[in-house]
Amino acid sequence: MAEAEESPGDPGTASPRPLFAGLSDISISQDIPVEGEITIPMRSRIREFDSSTLNESVRNTIMRDLKAVGKKFMHVLYPRKSNTLLRDWDLWGPLILCVTLALMLQRDSADSEKDGGPQFAEVFVIVWFGAVTITLNSKLLGGNISFFQSLCVLGYCILPLTVAMLICRLVLLADPGPVNFMVRLFVVIVMFAWSIVASTAFLADSQPPNRRALAVYPVFLFYFVISWMILTFTPQ
Amino acid sequence: MAAVDDLQFEEFGNAATSLTANPDATTVNIEDPGETPKHQPGSPRGSGREEDDELLGNDDSDKTELLAGQKKSSPFWTFEYYQTFFDVDTYQVFDRIKGSLLPIPGKNFVRLYIRSNPDLYGPFWICATLVFAIAISGNLSNFLIHLGEKTYHYVPEFRKVSIAATIIYAYAWLVPLALWGFLMWRNSKVMNIVSYSFLEIVCVYGYSLFIYIPTAILWIIPQKAVRWILVMIALGISGSLLTMTFWPAVREDNRRVALATIVTIVLLHMLLSVGCLAYFFDAPEMDHLPTTTATPNQTVAAAKSS
């Protein structure tokens, strides 16, 4: 027979009692609430939300997406440590930016000399495959960011460089010369630094701390190559 | 009455007892390496593993042996398998790069720095940086050489980036493949040869290309003598790195075969650097030519007008 050396709530009794014998004497006092309800209070509202986006006008849908994209542009232009870009990622912004950049960077197809600037497809491929490679690299190094979140951040942080491209295009309408080049160089360098700072602010936290430099260097190379393409753009 | 023995927890912490209960189980233990499944996919380690550890007298050869066996246990179609090739920290990559820049005679790069942890991060990103360094430097150098000419119109020469990428990546992957195949073949004939795994050879080649990045940037200087001195320095450093890595591997072999292998390795390396210099960078004497072609036009125009 089992003998308990000491039973709970009964220190120092001489008589041995079997284990758990006192359990039936325990009663739950009434002031500990042990009952409740399991409901999801938001449930009915979510269902209403779903059906309402189906019936709304096309303008509302487009405006909502455009506002989300615009909000993320603001986050890139004023990079703070927020995770709006990460939480509500979308790829519309990167697509718009990449298409704009590629359209402005492509060389004139009527003047297709052998060694000119990049074609539309080349810019597109560099941007998207570069972003995919950097994402794969950071995941392989052990980062805990998801694939599309990383693509989203890298795509959105091309915004300063697209602005630089627009400015360079405008500056190139003036007379060519060293002053022209200096202005473009300055603008591209500033926007390059801005892109790096913005993307590092979003991406650096997701890496293990002893590999942060390894994950950030490819981002630096990526934006450097894009800046080089912008700087060396010459209208035919 | 309940027996106390029935209520005791079963101890799971001891691998030995659970293995005696079930000998085929795979146990994972934090302190010691556990049993890993023997049917690993063909990671080309080869039978040379024990021999090279004995030959080169590494004092933590036990640890590297066991760690090497423990590492690649995921099947090759999972993501974790490829993550094992990126298992390096920042300081390790910097150490490997420093080791490739300062080859010390007698120190084997693979044994000293790679230590059974070959990574693909270094080779891949060093090659990517080198591709863009060569293309951008070549473009800049051509621009500076032809700067004063009236007939010169600057073009970004974007096509050269894809050509450079093809050349560099083909060199960094196909030459190690050929070398690994050759070493495996000799290993089957001469039993004492130290053989490296394919990834270690890729790793050595990748890190040996690092010296060409500052070399490519310095090739912008449009002086022929400076460029050739840079070629010699870079070839000296990376060639000696490769030689010191592969000499222990072919030392046991027939003298002529060993020498031929080393000479081929260095020759291919030289071919890469000289080829890149010749293709991407215009010769600096070209700026003299357009002034001589300009003057005949002027004389013809003067003759026509008179």
From Swiss-Prot, chain A:
Residues modified as Phosphoserine: 7
Molecular-function GO terms, alphabetical: identical protein binding
Pfam families on file: Yip1 (PF04893)
InterPro entries: Yip1/4-like (IPR045231), Yip1_dom (IPR006977)
Cellular component GO terms held in the UniProt record: cis-Golgi network; COPII-coated ER to Golgi transport vesicle; endoplasmic reticulum; Golgi medial cisterna; Golgi membrane; Golgi trans cisterna; trans-Golgi network
Keywords tagged on the record: Acetylation, Golgi apparatus, Membrane, Phosphoprotein, Transmembrane, Transmembrane helix
TM annotation in the entry: 85-105, 116-136, 147-167, 185-205, 213-233
Cytoplasmic topology ranges: 2-84, 137-146, 206-212
GO biological process, one term: endoplasmic reticulum to Golgi vesicle-mediated transport
Membrane topology, from the record: Multi-pass membrane protein
Segments in the Lumenal topological domain: 106-115, 168-184, 234-236
Modified residues (N-acetylalanine): 2
Origin superkingdom: Eukaryota
Subcellular location field: Golgi apparatus membrane
Family: Belongs to the YIP1 family.
Function: May be required for stable YIPF1 and YIPF2 protein expression.
Self-association and partners: Predominantly interacts with YIPF1 or YIPF2, but may also form a ternary complex with YIPF1 and YIPF2. This interaction may stabilize YIPF1 and YIPF2.
Protein name: Protein YIPF6
